[in-house]
């Protein structure tokens, strides 16, 4: 398949289909009709990223989707967590990239589960001498990869995979002296 055909197909997707025998993606779409999907968000972000940006993503379902979207024809760099599953990798890696390349724009991506592991770094990067970064947190209010496994292997019976929908990472960022923004 040519790159052009692949990009056209990718651009036409606006949500995730459920695995056979599960309906929780559909339930989330029906429940939260006013929210954009990760695919819609990734397309919007991709359109606004500088050509020379350093990108980092964490592990998890949201970033697995997003890994298909960034393009690298113009010198962008990508910091990948690899196959070791280092949950919480995205935020610290983008901080390190910005410290190492202070004049280069950086943007990190993580799901809410993975970001929760490293969000304490917000208290460090708010220091006046640290250069600014951008970090995007995708909220699906769950440990998505784990929830997917439990729904597939245990007849849609899951426990301990839901995250608090009332927690605002934007408010946590603001409390750390950073600028936090929520986009739906």
What are these regions (language model features)?
Residues 6, 10-22:
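Flexible, glycine/charged-enriched surface loops at secondary-structure junctions
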Residues 1-9, 64-184:
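Thiamine diphosphate
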Residues 18-103:
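Active-site diphosphate/adenylate-binding microenvironment
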């Amino acid at each position: 398949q040519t790159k052009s055909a692949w990009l056209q197909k990718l651009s036409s997707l606006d949500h995730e289909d459920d695995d056979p025998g599960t309906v929780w993606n559909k339930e989330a779409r029906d429940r939260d009709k006013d929210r954009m999907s990760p695919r819609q968000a990734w397309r919007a972000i991709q359109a606004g990223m500088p050509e020379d940006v350093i990108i980092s993503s964490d592990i998890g379902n949201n970033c697995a989707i997003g890994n298909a979207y960034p393009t690298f024809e113009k010198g962008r760099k990508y910091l990948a967590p690899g196959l070791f599953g280092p949950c919480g990798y995205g935020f610290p890696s983008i901080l390190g990239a910005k410290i190492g390349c202070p004049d280069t724009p950086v943007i990190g991506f993580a799901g809410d589960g993975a970001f929760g592991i490293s969000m304490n770094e917000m208290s460090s990067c708010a220091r006046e001498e640290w250069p600014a970064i951008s970090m995007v947190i995708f909220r699906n209010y769950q440990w998505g990869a784990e929830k997917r496994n439990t729904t597939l292997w245990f007849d849609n019976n899951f426990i301990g995979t839901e995250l608090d929908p009332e927690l605002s990472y934007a408010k946590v960022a603001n409390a750390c002296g950073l600028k936090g923004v929520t986009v739906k």
